[in-house]
Amino acid sequence: MIFDFLFPNRCLDCNQLIDKNEIICEICKDNIHFSNHQFSEINSLKEKVSLLFPVENAFSLMLYEKESLAQKIIQQLKYNHREKIGKNLAEWTIEKLSFEDKKPDLIATVPLHPKKLKQRGYNQLHIF
C-alpha cells in the first residue's frame, strides 16, 4: 500500500495515473492500432505467413509499427521484464479473438534465440 502511494502506476504512453492492474489508460488504449484479422479468410498477415508455410488463417493482436505505442509496449515487455504487460496482452487477445467454431490448431510465437535468452534472463512469451 505504501509502495503504491510512493510509486503509483502510470500509463506507459501519457504518464496518467491508472489502476495498478493496467499498463495504459483507456484513452491511449483507444489509440493502439489493433489488427482486425479475426481469422478472416483474407488478411495481410496470412499472406505474409503463407510465403513461409501453408496456413489457413493468421492473427496478430496489434500492428507493430515503428515509434508506435505497440512498439513501446512490446519493448517494455521484452527488455524491462514487465510481467504485467504480458498479462494485459493475454487479456486483450482474449477480448479481441472470437474463435466461434474455428479454434486454432496451434498458437505459434516467434522463438527467442538462446543468446537473447541468456542476455534477458527470461523468455517474455512465457509471461504471455
Where do the protein language model's features map onto the residues?
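Glycine-rich phosphate/pyrophosphate-handling loop used in enzymes and phosphotransfer proteins
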Residues: 1-128
